[in-house]
């Protein structure tokens, strides 16, 4: 009698276990596409992307290389080159000459910032299997190199031809706030003028924000990022005349990038 009871109990347990296994297998059988999509996301461990970055004091280009630590965490290498303008910059034109070129009055240097950093990106919300947006947050830190190029302008000089006749002559000169004013500045000179006098200011930067991935496929990247960046320089950078030199730049940014995931 006891043996029969034990046999029945074992049969019932085996039956229940079989039903449970079947129930666990059904989601993968019925949703094979979902399973394959998540499998691809895990298997593709590397990525590379590039794009443009717009920030509150200029614009530039950026590149990122990433590698998954796991499904929820990613290591990032971050590179960017941006120009950095002063909020006090105002472009003006000499009103006495019809072909005069605009320039930023009072600007001493054109400033560019080259960044290279390392950080992490973490998953907040993944895409549904039918598509959508993947949301992550990131934090990055690294080396920031400020580069200041002196501003050159075309200056109007009066040349005496006779006691009652003068002629205008244009010369290209480095901007000097004590010598150059709105009435004798004709306009900006060639952009490349002054690169041989470039000065370098080493520093550091930090970058935080959110990443929105709109890519329809796991192999492609269509990314939008929003966040903030701070660049700090031990030696301050002169940007505008009669203003304090800049020890740091704090900017808000928006970037759009495209790329691919691979192994």
Stretches with model-predicted labels:
Residues 140-225, 229-245, 258-262:
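Outer-membrane beta-barrel transmembrane domain signature
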Residues 1-41, 263:
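Cleavable N-terminal export/targeting peptides
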Residues 37-45, 91-102, 182-191, 232-235:
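Flexible, solvent-exposed coil segments and beta strand-coil junctions
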Residues 52, 61-67, 116-122, 141-145, ...:
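Residues on the lipid-exposed face of transmembrane beta-strands in outer-membrane beta-barrel proteins
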Residues 40-46, 68-76, 108, 125-135, ...:
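Short loop/turn motifs that connect adjacent beta-strands in outer-membrane beta-barrel proteins
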Residues 44-48, 55-59, 73-75, 110-114, ...:
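Residues that define the transmembrane beta-barrel architecture of outer-membrane proteins
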Residues 81-115, 119-130:
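Outer-membrane beta-barrel translocator/channel fold
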Residues 24-80:
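Short glycine/proline- and aromatic-enriched beta-strand/turn motifs that initiate or cap beta-hairpins
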């Amino acid at each position: 009698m006891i043996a029969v009871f034990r046999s029945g109990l074992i049969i019932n347990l085996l039956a229940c276990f079989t039903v449970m296994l079947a129930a666990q297998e059904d989601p993968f059988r019925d949703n094979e596409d979902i399973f394959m999509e998540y499998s691809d996301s895990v298997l593709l461990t590397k990525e590379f992307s590039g794009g443009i970055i717009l920030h509150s004091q200029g614009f530039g280009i950026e590149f990122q290389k990433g590698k998954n630590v796991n499904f929820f965490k990613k290591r990032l290498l971050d590179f960017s080159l941006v120009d950095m303008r002063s909020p006090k910059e105002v472009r003006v034109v000499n009103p006495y000459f019809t072909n005069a070129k605009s320039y930023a009055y009072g600007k001493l240097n054109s400033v560019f910032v080259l960044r290279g950093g390392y950080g992490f990106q973490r998953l907040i919300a993944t895409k549904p299997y039918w598509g959508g947006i993947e949301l992550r947050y990131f934090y990055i830190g690294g080396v920031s190199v400020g580069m200041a190029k002196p501003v050159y302008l075309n200056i109007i000089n009066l040349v005496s031809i006779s006691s009652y006749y003068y002629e205008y002559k244009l010369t290209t000169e480095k901007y000097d706030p004590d010598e150059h004013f709105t009435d004798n500045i004709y306009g900006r000179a060639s952009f490349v003028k002054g690169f041989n006098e470039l000065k370098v200011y080493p520093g550091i930067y930090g970058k935080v924000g959110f990443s929105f991935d709109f890519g329809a496929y796991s192999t492609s990247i269509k990314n939008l990022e929003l966040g903030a960046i701070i660049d700090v320089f031990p030696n301050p950078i002169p940007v505008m005349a009669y203003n304090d030199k800049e020890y740091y730049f704090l900017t808000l940014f928006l970037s759009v990038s495209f790329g691919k995931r691979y192994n």
